[in-house]
UniProtKB/Swiss-Prot annotation:
HAMAP family reported for this sequence: Glycogen_synth
Any one biological process term the GO annotation gives: glycogen biosynthetic process
Protein name from the UniProt record: Glycogen synthase 1
Cellular component terms per the entry's GO annotation: cytosol
NCBIfam families for the chain: glgA (TIGR02095), PRK00654.1-2 (NF001899)
Name of the encoding gene: glgA1
InterPro entries found in the cross-reference section: Glyco_trans_1, GS/SS, Starch_synth_cat_dom
Top EC group: transferase
Function noted in UniProt: Synthesizes alpha-1,4-glucan chains using ADP-glucose.
Alphabetical list of Gene3D superfamilies matching this protein: Glycogen Phosphorylase B
GO terms of molecular function: alpha-1,4-glucan glucosyltransferase (ADP-glucose donor) activity; alpha-1,4-glucan glucosyltransferase (UDP-glucose donor) activity
Family membership noted in the UniProt record: Belongs to the glycosyltransferase 1 family. Bacterial/plant glycogen synthase subfamily.
Species this chain originates from: Rhizobium radiobacter
Amino acid sequence: MNVLSVSSEIYPLIKTGGLADVVGALPIALEAHGVRTRTLIPGYPAVKAAVTDPVKCFEFTDLLGEKADLLEVQHERLDLLILDAPAYYERSGGPYLGQTGKDYPDNWKRFAALSLAAARIGAGVLPGWRPDMVHAHDWQAAMTPVYMRYAETPEIPSLLTIHNIAFQGQFGANIFSKLALPAHAFGMEGIEYYNDVSFLKGGLQTATALSTVSPSYAEEILTAEFGMGLEGVIGSRAHVLHGIVNGIDADVWNPATDHLIHDNYSAANLKNRALNKKAVAEHFRIDDDGSPLFCVISRLTWQKGIDLMAEAVDEIVSLGGRLVVLGAGDVALEGALLAAASRHHGRVGVAIGYNEPLSHLMQAGCDAIIIPSRFEPCGLTQLYALRYGCIPVVARTGGLADTVIDANHAALASKAATGVQFSPVTLDGLKQAIRRTVRYYHDPKLWTQMQKLGMKSDVSWEKSAGLYAALYSQLISKGH
């Protein structure tokens, strides 16, 4: 089975968030199920610099008015197709934002071109290779099924995965005439959305099937609270909507072999975790006194509940705990956390930015990680935490609810609990969860039991890859 995956980012070449991790790990996990995946990605400077000896395999003479070369290359275990279009992707900023921190004004064209190239590959323009289906990810690739329906050929099926419905690729109606689509594509059954153009809405309408990254999130986006205005469109296609939870790369995230942490350990031998805890305290220059050490590793935004977290810092300290934070985002939230660190010198440490090695060390050394997201399609941070014996304290939403077993009376009695959930997502709810966590921490036998259960949880891609492979087979066998 040959599948074309289409994405705006892929780990380890270019990453701004969890999308890259998923797109980079899933093809490798699918190999065991007989699925060969080729991933189409934009030819950003960082991507072209990272690969070795790419080979030109096709030339697009007119991709929305620009020429582009298609390069094929193997990078580690990934089979890549790179869309080398300097007019679109040769930028000095990031994948989506310029150096000023604002969206590139032509993002609509940059990612429509990526989708159009994908649709043409799906139609068979590459000599000697044509996919059996196309798997597009998020709004940046959501025009792929649109072009497959309107501009190319709908002979093969398409799957659109929604990683976060908050990002929809919405642009003014004035761009429609430049998208190389027939006039009737601008309508309710196409890409029109309240007199604007919405790439994601178009993909939701035209893909053969839809998926999102956890069963709970698949249910949530059917509601007005979480559907971000698209719940009606998704509801009309609920019969083809699937929720498949993300996994993690269990080789990269393995405390027994991880070279980024201070000391290795396993569920069978947790002693060395204490050495990592000491290393975290030293890094953040906070007290090393054996008290419960909480952490936050996150984008510092309202969606992630960081405003609540900033208000809950005093509660952690009053309970005798400590807190370390790694992340960046909203300047006001960064400031609130930095102020808390100044207020609680020796008890709270904050590092603004993102640091992959430090995130590994924090998972390996902190006792618990707090994830108070208002919505969370899947979340990977809590999966890393489970793997590392760092107890997740999570809002009961989306993938967080699906992957963490709350330490309620029933779960504690049956020895199944792996973390702490709270709802509603309010300051009081978060404070209560923190108090519960501190109480469990002071019961060493229970705490160790929860750690070991989490570490033994199957958070790898193996099961989820099987579900994707089965869905692919189902779509291909049905035809389009």
